[in-house]
A protein has these predicted regions:
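Transmembrane alpha-helices of multi-pass inner-membrane enzymes
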Residues: 1-6, 145-190
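Internal/C-terminal transmembrane anchor helices
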Residues: 21-40, 184-205
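Hydrophobic alpha-helical transmembrane segments in integral membrane proteins
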Residues: 38-54, 195-224
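Interfacial juxtamembrane loops and adjacent helix segments
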Residues: 73-116
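Hydrophobic transmembrane alpha-helices and their immediate junctions
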Residues: 118-146, 301
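Conserved small/polar residues in nucleotide/adenosyl-binding loops
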Residues: 318-320
Length: 320
């Protein structure tokens, strides 16, 4: 964006005409510096880098399984868990992949996450809208706003900013700012829109914050294994926190410890919609053990070993 603002294109043409050899050497040196910087960053934390690449590989496999419609909003974790489970079940993988595999909630790449949840066509449409807004913004010489959008796009390539409401509101406002004309009423409308969305989110977040506070208080008893005392608290919090995987897992685990396998399985099946954690499969397997259905228990525990082969806990349960 700054290059457009500073007319770097014209300056580079002049430099190419006058100092071709210097331009070639400088370009080669810049490429070498970027490659060296990338290699140094990889060497600094190789497992982290390999884990990120493996995560993207599994996310691509999830997209390939359902490329058109995706798995729905919030469906990334479940889709990722199933795709990783299917990948390791084939047995055709490298040892380093087993070492770096995990149970992520996000893809650490907003483009892949959107493709998994919404499908490829809608992802391309959204990207086209963003590029169109950038084109209009650069044409209107709003380089600062376009630079902010570019920064968010680069950030989105290796993280998950759009999973946080504040970044979603920021992105929408920046894109609208790219295409708005210089009429005061349009900018006032943008301010009112941003304020309205923020106020709505704040109201919802305040209710959720209080529920989470109550959950944290109840979790003290959960961590102390006082399952009988805390079951009622979790039941009361369930309507507000029924889309939080960690809460659902704890609630299902409490029901398992209270010898209520059917209820526990129902809650844990809901947790699987929002999480790829193999511990959910382990507890479901143990619930089937409680009911005497050992074949079903074995199936769930074997699925857990495929989801994260590096874990030995489900193997120990199978041999009990």
């Amino acid at each position: 964006v700054y290059a457009c603002y500073a007319d770097w294109g014209i300056k580079l043409k002049k430099a190419w005409q006058q100092y071709r050899r210097l331009v070639v050497v400088s370009a080669f040196g810049g490429v070498c510096a970027l490659v060296l910087a990338g290699w140094l960053m990889f060497v600094l934390k190789p497992d982290s880098a390999c884990g990120r690449l493996f995560m993207w590989k599994i996310a691509c496999r999830a997209v390939a399984e359902q490329p058109l419609l995706g798995y729905g909003m919030g469906g990334f974790a479940a889709a990722y868990g199933n795709a990783q489970e299917a990948y390791f079940a084939t047995g055709d993988y490298e040892l380093w992949e087993e070492r770096v595999a995990g149970s992520p909630e996000y893809a650490f790449n907003e483009y892949l996450q959107t493709a998994v949840e919404l499908g490829g066509p809608l992802t391309l449409c959204l990207l086209a809208v963003v590029l169109f807004c950038l084109y209009i913004g650069i044409k209107n010489k709003r380089f600062g706003i376009c630079g902010a959008v570019f920064s968010l796009m680069i950030f989105s390539f290796s993280s998950y900013p759009l999973q946080l409401p504040v970044f979603v509101v920021t992105a929408v406002c920046l894109l609208l700012a790219c295409i708005l004309r210089n009429y005061r009423w349009e900018w006032m409308g943008l301010v009112i829109l941003a304020g309205g969305i923020g106020a709505t989110r704040l109201k919802n977040d305040l209710c959720m914050e209080q529920a989470c506070r109550n959950w944290m208080n109840a979790r003290i008893f959960y961590n102390a294994a006082a399952y009988g005392s805390v079951e009622k608290e979790y039941r009361l919090l369930y309507p507000l926190l029924k889309k939080r995987a960690a809460f659902l897992f704890e609630y299902g685990h409490i029901l398992h410890k209270q010898q209520k396998p059917e209820e526990s399985i129902r809650i844990l099946m809901e947790a699987m919609k929002y999480s790829s954690d193999p511990m959910i499969l382990n507890i479901i397997g143990k619930n089937h053990q409680q009911t005497g259905d050992y074949l079903a228990a074995e199936r769930w525990l074997i699925r857990s070993t495929y989801r994260l082969p590096g874990r030995i806990y489900p193997l120990s349960l199978i041999h009990i």
